[in-house]
């Protein structure tokens, strides 16, 4: 075992040279998969098994909101020039808003059923998507919905800054005692974008509480091991709040996050040769894409925060982008055990977009 460990730790990293052209081809193909498999209602093809050439049953509205977010991100980078992407994002957003449930305190959140629970993550990523839509279009028609989603998220927040995972329409209240390792970071980014859209309304206060919780207590309280939990949503939030005046403990958390994401890329890049015996299969597209999202968001923080020491974020980001692009199938999807989900394409697209933006910045302050 000791010999195996030595071989693994000493294994060389395999990182082909990054080409933004290759990344863009993969981004476009992944987006095309989402667009061409979308139903007229706006619902995405959620899960597909290529062995039987058939969709699998079930649907996840949080991932629907995430897929919509990714399309809006791409549309912003493309400056709205690809109408198919924009129209698919709009259909996806309409699907969410048609399922909005009124909650307490003037809030709202989408649910698969009017009698079903509202998930904090769905509301948060719907808010993120609407914020991106507002940036893309300048259209203010959904400002009321954005604020209602924000009120819902604030109502889900606990005194320690963490977020409850569900709101129950039967009781008209949050479901007590159940948190989510994803929802807290998702909510922080949504509320941060809401503050950026409407400064002076107080939406930054819950964001500060969440950032303090993430930076200090979350991993231990929620028993997430090893710390820090590789939370790309937290990374997005840190990048979004770089001009807010982050405190030292927030930056220390960012450094730990960057180290974790970088370690994950390095480990994957060492899976060639004899080191293969110590590695599990490459993560699915969704999992790998979140690493790139996290690194890209943190690089933005690094470029704009002089208190942070230099770190090889761009190198890790580009290494991961090459490996992710190479893992894409000919139909534009990322498969794991011959199955793919919409969030595989979502996170891969968003992660590769982060690498593309990083390459264009060239490691320089924008």
Predicted regions located by residue number:
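Glycan-recognition and catalytic cores of secretory/periplasmic carbohydrate-active enzymes
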Residues: 1-366
